[in-house]
UniProtKB/Swiss-Prot annotation:
Originating organism: Streptomyces griseus
Pfam families noted in UniProt: PP_kinase, PP_kinase_C, PP_kinase_C_1, PP_kinase_N
Catalytic residues of the enzyme: 449 (phosphohistidine intermediate)
Superkingdom of this protein's organism: Bacteria
Cofactor entry: Mg(2+)
Name of this protein: Polyphosphate kinase
GO terms for cellular component: polyphosphate kinase complex
Task of the protein: Catalyzes the reversible transfer of the terminal phosphate of ATP to form a long-chain polyphosphate (polyP).
GO process terms (BP): polyphosphate biosynthetic process
Region (Disordered): 1-21
Similarity comment: Belongs to the polyphosphate kinase 1 (PPK1) family.
């Protein structure tokens, strides 16, 4: 494992050609560019209006997490003196300045998009997001009653004076800073009122007219401070360091000793203060002083703050204002055309492997049905399963409980530390244990991120293993919104690999090599680099050669260096990335590298790795992104695709995603992304997701 090395002081291997400086783009800048692409979808008038509201909420939620984790980590590195340059050559201080400048621009654009486009356009469709003064007297009277009955009892006004120290402001909470005056003494006082997070963010004043909850509280502050004059109130919101796990960057290993105390406290230091533009300088000064934030961390914005509340608006039942409804179909290899009975998935897998592409192929009639059938089948002896993120009421969890209760051996490998999901994960892990499942909590120091299921079944005199290897979590809800791949197979090699890997995860196996899997942290990075290098040899020998990756993030320096070497040697390298990309394309050092990004109604989540291999293409897919944490500190698995039809389908997918006729963003050598949504004649380019939806619809229409 390379994790002992300092990731920020990455030294390339000194074999072969010297690679030029400047081949890495800054990862934080690249992440902000990714969130800008989300914002562009919200700004695009061609996106349905409720989906635009949804993208505004996604942008806000993404940025919250970015500040809580990445910005907090940078500040921590600066404060503790672990300030090595990043791979892009910038000092942490320079990166922080860049983030502050860029995020300020993006947050201003985000607020303007809401004020100038989204709110007025929603109003045109009869969904009015209004402020307290815009309400009718009747609406105000109704909301006053609501305030008295449902809001007032849960509010806690906290005074600030010599007897009452400044209260602790929890991360991401909405707060009112209130200035009151005592009419007797004439003294001004400051108080803080927290907006209860469990109350609905936008309340319906009358049908299709919504008002932010903080407006209702602000309009009735006299109720909270009887006998006092309310002089002013201002909204503010604090973002804190809440990255509970020390991960993400190898540099942070040095910090663990220094950080133990801090990490034990849930309350990290503030990293951002959002305030309304109209805030009184006296109040702002007090907040800045008490919260100990710098001027650069203060973000004045037009209200309302905290637009993640738009998720609720986006989920209103107005289908005509959303993307056209799409219902996933059952994969044709699993569909029982003849009968209405549930298909026998094991019988189907004895005939052939099934390549699933969610959400176009239904999760519930494939992966979920596979596990449910296994749970109810008397011939199934054992089920082994990894769970990284799932929902507590998940049918997957129910199936595993049923299996354990009917006497089957059930091993569940649970990853408790899926960030920000810890509570939920602990809950259903207990539920599984109580039912008699063997629950294992991963390997020390390694997160289990691979997506695997293994079913062992008695068939005559032999035991047969059936497997599922995927790119996405076993989470039926996200399976409808995330684009993911999965392989259901009865192949004995994959079955043997999964048996070995599960033994490694639950016991003391030291196996490092597998038949059809590449497994991190040992063989995955080296396996991919060896294959990239092999493409150079194929190219020099005049055989077909290419490298095509589809990933969520492309940051790992060793993988990037291998790609740059291949590109320098003349091998075409195509990278289809959703989020961060630190590889600099199409410059004189890498003219053979093309980078594209696609965002849309589904979150592109699958990871695919394809190699020309001298005319015999090799294709892998699985759970791993090209990041340190995935390759060094997580158990990840990629599976080799052996069925020629499956290889061809995945190659077609990658070609379509990279094609100039497909709508996408293109990364330039300067690190800037440009959106390509129309052709030279101004006609809209096709979106890969729309093409796949269309293909599924056509397939269903043909008998």
């Amino acid at each position: 494992i390379r994790s002992g090395r300092d990731a920020d002081a990455y030294e390339p291997d000194r074999d072969g050609d010297e690679l030029p400086q400047g081949r890495f783009l800054d990862r934080e800048r690249s992440w902000l560019a990714f969130n800008e692409r989300v914002l562009e979808l919200a700004e695009d008038p061609a996106t349905p209006i409720l989906e635009r509201a949804n993208f505004l909420a996604i942008f806000a939620s993404n940025l919250d997490e970015f500040f809580m984790v990445r910005v907090a980590g940078l500040k921590r590195r600066i404060a503790t003196g672990v300030a090595t340059r990043s791979a892009s050559g910038l000092q942490p201080r320079e990166v922080l300045d860049l983030i502050w400048t860029r995020s300020r621009e993006l947050m201003a654009r985000h607020a303007a998009c809401y004020q100038q486009d989204i709110a007025p356009d929603l109003s045109d469709e009869g969904i009015q997001l209004i402020r307290w003064p815009d309400l009718t007297e009747k609406e105000q009277a109704r909301l006053f009653t609501f305030f008295r009955q449902r809001v007032f009892p849960v509010l806690t006004p906290l005074a600030v004076d010599p007897a009452h120290p400044f209260p602790y402001i929890s991360g991401l909470s909405l707060n009112l800073a209130v200035v009151v005056r005592n009419p007797v003494s004439g003294h001004r006082h400051f108080a803080r009122v927290k907006v209860p997070p469990l109350l609905t963010r936008f309340l319906e004043a009358s049908p299709q007219r919504y008002v932010p909850i903080e407006d209702i509280i602000a309009a009735h502050l006299e109720e909270l401070f009887p006998g006092m004059e309310v002089l002013a109130h201002h909204m503010f919101r604090v973002t804190r360091n809440e990255d509970l796990e020390v991960e993400e960057d190898d540099a942070e290993n040095l910090l663990q000793a220094l950080e133990k105390e801090l990490m034990r406290r849930r309350f990290g230091p503030p990293v951002r203060l959002e305030v309304e533009e109209s805030i009184d300088p006296y109040v702002l000064d007090l907040l800045v002083r008490e919260l100990k934030v710098s001027d650069a961390e203060v973000y004045p914005l037009p209200g309302p703050l905290e637009l993640t509340g738009l998720f609720a608006i986006a989920s209103l039942d107005r289908p005509e204002l959303k993307f056209p409804k799409f219902i996933a179909g059952t994969h044709r290899d699993l569909a029982e055309v003849e009968s209405a009975s549930a298909p026998d998935i094991f019988a189907a897998l004895r005939e052939r492997d099934v390549l699933l592409h969610h959400p176009y192929d239904s999760f519930s009639t494939s992966v979920q049905a596979f596990l449910e059938q296994a749970a109810g089948d008397p011939d199934v002896l054992a089920i082994k399963q990894t769970l990284y993120r799932t929902s507590g009421d998940s049918p997957i969890v129910d199936a595993l409980i049923d299996a354990a209760e009917s006497g089957k051996q059930v091993l569940v490998l649970v990853e408790i530390k899926a960030r920000f999901d810890e509570q939920a994960n602990i809950k259903w892990a207990r539920k599984l244990e109580e039912a008699g499942c063997h629950v294992v909590y991963g390997l020390v120091g390694l997160k289990t991120h691979c997506k695997l299921s293994l079913v062992v079944r008695q068939e005559g005199d032999t035991l047969r293993r059936y497997s599922h290897v995927g790119t996405g979590n076993y989470h039926p809800k996200t399976a409808r919104l995330y684009e993911d791949l999965g392989l259901l197979t009865g192949d004995p090699q994959v079955g043997a690999d999964l048996s070995d890997l599960f033994n490694r995860l639950s016991g003391y196996s030291r196996r490092e090599t597998y038949r059809r899997l590449l497994v991190a942290p040992k063989s995955l990075r080296d396996g991919l680099i060896a294959r990239i290098n092999k493409e150079i040899a194929h190219h020099r020998a005049g055989r077909p050669a290419y490298v095509r990756f589809k990933v969520n993030s492309m940051v790992d320096e060793a993988i990037i260096d291998a790609c740059c070497r291949a590109a320098q040697a003349g091998v075409p390298v195509d990278i289809w990335v959703r989020g961060i990309c630190a590889i600099r394309p199409a410059s004189r050092l890498s003219e053979n590298i093309r980078v594209r990004s696609i965002l849309g109604r589904f979150l592109e989540h699958s990871r695919v790795f394809s190699f020309g291999n001298g005319g015999e293409p090799e294709v892998w897919f699985g759970s791993a992104d090209m990041m340190h944490r995935n390759l060094d500190r997580r158990i990840e698995a990629l599976v080799r695709v052996t069925d020629p039809a499956h290889r061809a389908a995945l190659s077609r997918l990658l070609e379509t995603g990279m094609a100039d006729t497909t709508a996408s963003w293109h990364l330039g050598p300067d690190g800037n992304w440009t959106r390509h949504a129309t052709d030279a004649d101004g006609q809209p380019l096709r979106h890969v997701q729309e093409m796949l939806i269309e293909a599924r619809r056509r397939r269903r229409a043909t008998p």
